[in-house]
Amino acid sequence: MRKVSDDLWVYNTRDLMRASSCDHCTRLAIARELRIPGVAELVEKFEVPVAGLPIDYGMKFEADLEAELLESLGAEAFRKPEGSGYLAETIALMNDGVPVIYQGSLEHQIGRVKFSGRPDFLVRADYDLAFVDGKLTAIQDIERSSVGYIAWDAKLAGSPKPHYLLQVALYVDALAVLGLKAEGARHGLILGSRTLTTFEEGEIVPAMRQARSYILDAIENLEVEQFAFDSLSLHCDSADSCKVCEYPGLCAHNRLELDHLVQVAGINKSQIE
């Protein structure tokens, strides 16, 4: 999450994932952006670069899908925004009716809070993604309307996870605001098992809006004194939430400190917290 100005905060899909499961993540991010004394100095010790084998494998998976679609559809039917104005170019490509858009850009602002993200694939309403002979392609259904786009995200995982659906729902909602959402379509995930899974809008958007409301409420009703360092929890509510936490090392460190206090002082965690 980024504070651009007093009147604009920007969040992405991972911020929404965190907000859906852990108050600690959202509050710590807001405190960091508010420059609460002590917060930046603490979290910078636990910043983790976005790298490693899972990221490398994920990028290769996406690159393979990109190459397969380009080979299948050709350069005119499979496009990627190339300039600096990704959002404007993405909208232009959709208005031009390009069948498949790779790594486009979508935004949606409510009050002082703006979502900014990049769906892996935006597919025109009259096309279906499909694996043919093990390779990804898009097949046109000429009986369907070509108006609007369907959001797809690629995930290396072999099965859908709840926070993946929040991402897709954000893209669906942003398309709707632009008036470029395919009506009645099922949006979905391209999984590492080379299978597709789809969802109706009503299955995924309500949960996204609930998670988003936590971010909106926190920013729209923001009072700086509520984010004083001493009021912040320094670990996720559960170890499972650390899978999407910005500072998992801080969580582990803080839990270790609390366990040490319990052992030394003979008190329970509820007394510490």
Language-model features: locations:
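Conserved structured core elements
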Residues: M59, F115, P162-L165, A169, ...
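Conserved catalytic cores of phosphodiester-cleaving nucleases, focusing on short active-site segments
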Residues: F115-Q140, S145-G158, Y171-D173, N268
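Active-site-adjacent structural elements in folded domains
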Residues: T137-A138, L256-H260
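Beta-sheet entry/capping signal
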Residues: P99, D120, G148-I150, G184-G188
